[in-house]
Each structure stands twice: as C-alpha cells, then as structure tokens.
Amino acid sequence: MAKIKNKELLQSYVLTTAKYDFSVYEKRILYRIVEIQQELLEGKKLNERYFLAANHHQDVTYTLPISLFLKEDDRNNHKEVKKAFRSLQTKIIEYQDEDTWASLSIIANPKIKTRTETITFTIDKMINDVFLDFSKGYRTCKKRVR
C-alpha cells in the first residue's frame, strides 16, 4: 500500500480570486501548473516526462502526460480532461495596468498526442506570471501525494 503524504502548494490570490467556478478537472489542471511552477521556483528538477519551453514572447508551452490530470482510479477519462482544457481555453482573464490592457485565455492551443499520451498547451506569459504573483498574497493548498 502506498504511503500518502501531503505536499504544500502556494496559490496566488490573483488566481484564487478569479471570478470563475472551476470544475474538478479544471482545478486539477491549474493546480498541476501551480505545482510545476513552484518546483521551478524552488530550483527543483522536473519530472523527465514534463517539458516546458518559452518562445521569444516568453509564452510557455507545456507538454505533460495526460495521466497528470486524471484520478488514480480513473486513468482513462480523457473525455473529461479534453472538456476541461476546452473550458479553460474559453475562460478569459482581463489584465490592465497603467501601460497595458489585455484579454487572455487561461490556456491556448491544447493538443493531445494519442500515441504518446501527452497534452501540449500554451500559456501566455502574462497568465503564467499570475501563477507566480504573490504580491496580493497567497493561499496554502495541500496536495495528497502517493
């Protein structure tokens, strides 16, 4: 039997206070992104199956195993993962400061490679920065790790 322990994640209030009701699968996707970004901030090496690349605009493209977003007891529910990515793609975060106004999808261009069981998607630099913006405070989340 696998030992279960808790892993602490910090979630920016900017993300926490977004005016959306996220589904369980959408939350799972967002929490995994927060977890990955937190590991990078802490200087930890990512799982070898995770691939992140920034383009010249510093938007980040993630390639991750689909299993990362599935429940342990439901490893074949790709339909729900696709639905959650589509939904996050249609959710807009509006950003404005003294220099810039932007209307951005939380996630862009999700693509599943069925042979490799991976999903690739892009997050705009401004959205990715929201995951790391603790200037308005943060919320501590506990993730159960097996």
Enumerate the language-model features and the residues they cover:
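Charged, alpha-helix-forming regions
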Residues: M1-R146
